[in-house]
Amino acid sequence: MTKWLSISDVKEKIAATSAEEVTASYLELIDKSSINGYTCTSDGALDTAKMVDKGEVAGPLAGVPIAIKDNISTKGLATTCSSKILEGYVPPYDAHVIERLKEAGAVIIGKTNMDEFAMGTSTESSCYGVTLNPWDHERVPGGSSGGSAAVVAAGEAPISLGSDTGGSVRCPAAFCGVVGLKPTYGAVSRYGLISYANSLEQIGPMATCVEDIAAVMDVIGGYDARDSTSIDKKIDHQAALIDDVKGLKIGVPDEYFGEGVDSGTENAVWDAINKYEEMDASWEKVSMPNTKYALAAYYTIAMSEASSNLARFDGTRYGPRNDGENWHVMASKTRAENFGKEVQRRILLGTYALSAGYQDKYYLKALQVRTLVKQDFDRAFANFDVLMAPTMPLPAFKIGEMVEDPLSQYLIDVNTVPMNLAGVPCISVPCGSSDGLPVGLQIIGNHFDEAALIRAAYSFEKNTDHHKARPGEVA
């Protein structure tokens, strides 16, 4: 079977052969893979495919395999957040997005590797070991949804789901040369997502083309009463697949370029922006002055929420349990021995930020900065349809390069965390290369204006070939 199939390609293969044969081909690719992108595959995948062939399962994604990040609950299929503390945990229910995918006929083919509890930018903190970037096996795939991006880039799944708390869909999409969308906060239900930071994260799709992103969003998007942050606003993503950006007003934030940005990355992004000008869009620079405070505010908020969210993992109900003479000793030993170093670091920092005497100084100040960052976006979208910037300031770095310096990893999230603070949607699309490694163009839209993102990204794809580049070649 040919690798790197789109949804429409998969449907053609199914029509020519069968859903069972297509699913079996993907399972064979996964079995032979050397990138460590999956944590497990689904025993029920072939059964679902057979049901599609019999006409017992139908829908817009009938028979299409999809890979799921390991922090999204899948009934009967292990969901561990790539952490020892959830070893062996099998959810008794499906996340809302999984319910939607199954209703649409999709085949859940397996779970993908990730940074432990979605805390990281490299997938190096996984208890299953690092996922390798398909473009260069000595480099990271990005994170925290590194497995989800890598398996799509390697042709081991046509589409995947990740989660994005501060860039965790867009970063690996950029590093692996695929398309990744972070929807507006509230546009996709978080029911069944094992939370890192509730007020920041969203589930989003990854694929080799914008068309597939739109198709998946039309399935998983929409209101869910079980998620109190879910907003009842219907968006027709596929209707926005229009190759026309004439009159599109693009804002280019000064603060997302310059010092710290790799020159090859910056050149590729400017080439992309100039391409839009050739396509009759217009661009203008814009200042977003509070960007310089966003990173500190983001990590203060995210770690504070993490310290609260992860308090529930203590070995009492699931996962490994260490012996102790009482509950406190048992829980303390269990957490100390089964949470990884990065997760422990973030829990400690978050607990400190929320502690008596420091909450006003750090956490509440961070919330005030969050409002200022959102106001920057509000002002920008009063004049522009979309904003454009590099997704990441540099291409994929080498495995182990930043492990001993966590602050350096935090800093490279500088271009992605502001959108999570503001809750606005954004998409990363391949726009070229730097030293033979993929570069992502980040397109940012106003709240619930995913249509503008998809239209802009789709038009770029139709007029360039960057999204067609595959590991082993450069567009």
Swiss-Prot record:
Q: Name one GO cellular component term.
A: glutamyl-tRNA(Gln) amidotransferase complex
Report the superkingdom from the record: Archaea
Q: What are the annotated disulfide bridges?
A: none
The protein's UniProt keywords, in alphabetical order, are: ATP-binding, Ligase, Nucleotide-binding, Protein biosynthesis
Residues at the catalytic site: 69, 144, 168
Keyword hit for Cell inner membrane:
no
Q: Matching PROSITE patterns, A to Z?
A: AMIDASES
Report the GO molecular function annotations. ATP binding; glutaminyl-tRNA synthase (glutamine-hydrolyzing) activity
Q: Which GO terms describe its biological process?
A: translation
Enumerate the Pfam families for this protein. Amidase (PF01425)
User: Catalytic activity annotated for this protein?
Assistant: L-glutamyl-tRNA(Gln) + L-glutamine + ATP + H2O = L-glutaminyl-tRNA(Gln) + L-glutamate + ADP + phosphate + H(+)
Main EC class the enzyme belongs to? ligase
Asked whether the keyword Metal-binding is assigned, the reply is: no
InterPro entries given for it? Answer: Amidase, Amidase_CS, Amidase_dom, AS_sf, GatA
Provide the E.C. number(s) assigned to this enzyme: 6.3.5.7
- Transmembrane ranges, per UniProt, are none
Describe the protein's quaternary organization and the partners it interacts with.
Heterotrimer of A, B and C subunits.
Write out the function statement from the record. Answer: Allows the formation of correctly charged Gln-tRNA(Gln) through the transamidation of misacylated Glu-tRNA(Gln) in organisms which lack glutaminyl-tRNA synthetase. The reaction takes place in the presence of glutamine and ATP through an activated gamma-phospho-Glu-tRNA(Gln).
Instruction: Give the family from UniProt.
Output: Belongs to the amidase family. GatA subfamily.
Name recorded for this polypeptide: Glutamyl-tRNA(Gln) amidotransferase subunit A
Q: Which organism is it from?
A: Methanococcoides burtonii (strain DSM 6242 / NBRC 107633 / OCM 468 / ACE-M)
